């Protein structure tokens, strides 16, 4: 938001005053910065965050993974099919309930973690934001994510 002097009034319809626009541009640009780091590994940003989640907790249902990543099944299903084709994950139907699909990392899915280990540091080296400012921003963004996920439609 731009600073205003005493003679100006806040314009709620000004593009520069839109939090959603600032978040959109930052998200788009950060993903653009990730692309040259991920492409050599055959990953997209979405497949990368999927792996990050699975490295934390493997053998989860598609529903759990979608909730964790804030992705709907229309986005997640083709992504998981592609990742399975790359040999990074397997999809297994539940024994008792055939509708439940479990996602597990393969040996390759676990091994690629080592190749991704320096990506966060490489991103920090691009001087996007120093750690002192990143921590409170991350807390604020998590609060926004929580609020949005729990807000009535």
Where do the PLM segments sit?
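N-terminal helix-turn-helix DNA-binding core of bacterial DNA-binding proteins
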Residues: 28-75
């Amino acid at each position: 938001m731009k600073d205003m002097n005493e003679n100006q009034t806040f314009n709620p319809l000004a593009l520069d005053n839109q939090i959603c626009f600032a978040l959109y541009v930052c998200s788009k640009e950060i993903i653009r910065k990730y692309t040259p780091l991920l492409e050599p590994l055959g990953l997209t940003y979405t497949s990368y965050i999927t792996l990050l989640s699975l490295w934390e907790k493997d053998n989860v249902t598609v529903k759990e993974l979608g909730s964790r990543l804030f992705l709907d099944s229309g986005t997640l299903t083709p992504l998981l099919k592609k990742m399975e084709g790359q040999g990074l994950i397997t999809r297994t139907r539940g024994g008792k309930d055939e509708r439940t699909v479990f996602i597990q990392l393969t040996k390759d899915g676990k091994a690629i973690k080592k190749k991704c280990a320096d990506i966060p540091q490489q991103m920090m080296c691009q001087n996007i934001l120093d750690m002192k400012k990143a921590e409170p921003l991350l807390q604020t963004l998590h609060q926004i994510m929580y609020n949005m996920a729990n807000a009535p439609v």
